[in-house]
Amino acid sequence: MASTHDYVKDLRNEDIKIYINGEYHHRSEAKISVFDSGFLLGDGVWEGIRLHNSKLIHLEHHIDRLYDGAKSIAMEIHLSKKEIIEAIWSTLNENNMITDTHIRLIVSRGIKSTPYQHPKVTISLPTIVIIPEYKKANKEVIDRGIRLVSVQTRRDSLVQDPKINSLSKMNCISACIEAEKLGAEEGLMLDPNGFVSTCNSTNFFIITNNEVWTSTGEYCLNGV
C-alpha cells in the first residue's frame, strides 16, 4: 500500500554513515544503548529536514522547533544550535550528499541507570543521532494521490502536547493502524471538538479559490 512517505528505492542508502554523539558509524553497525531514554520511553524530540540542491530547507525553523520541544519537556540539549547545524552538515559531507536527502535528527534524554521514567536516573548527556537517507518522492504516488479516511483516534492535549515533535508517536501510530484497517493510506485526525486537526504523518491543507485552509494549529505539530 502506498503512503505519503513513499520514496524511490536507492541502493546508496545501504552504505550510509550515521552520526551518533559525534562519531560516524556504518548503518549496519550504528547502535544505541538499550537503556537509552528514547528506546525505553520515547523520551526525546526529533526533526525531519530535507536537503535539496545543497540547501537544507527551513533549517533554522526546524532547529528552533527542536529546541522549543526540548525545553517544554525540561531537557537541555548540551550542544548549541550552531553545533547541531555543523553536525548535520558534517554528516552530509561524510556521506557526500547534495540533494534528494531526508535527515532524521533525533535527541533523546540520554542513558538511564535503570528502566525508569524519572529524569533523575539519567546518567549521560542527551543522545544525538543524525540519520541521512536518499529519499526522492515516488512519482507514482504524486500522480495517483493517496486515500484519506477520518479516524476515531483524536489529537488531544489532555494527555500529551500535540505541538511537540516527540519521539513518542503512539497517538499517530494508532491513527495510522486504524486508517490501514479501513483501507486508506493516511488517517485524518480530529481535535477534541470534532474539527480537522492533522493527519497521522502529515499536516492537512485544502487549497481552494486561491486560498489555503488548514487547522488552527492548536492540536497538531505546527508545520515548518
Model-based region annotation:
Residues M1-L188, P192-F195, L221:
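Conserved alpha/beta cores of soluble small-molecule-handling proteins
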Residues L188, F195-N222:
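Glycine- and Gly-Pro-enriched alpha-helical subdomains that act as flexible
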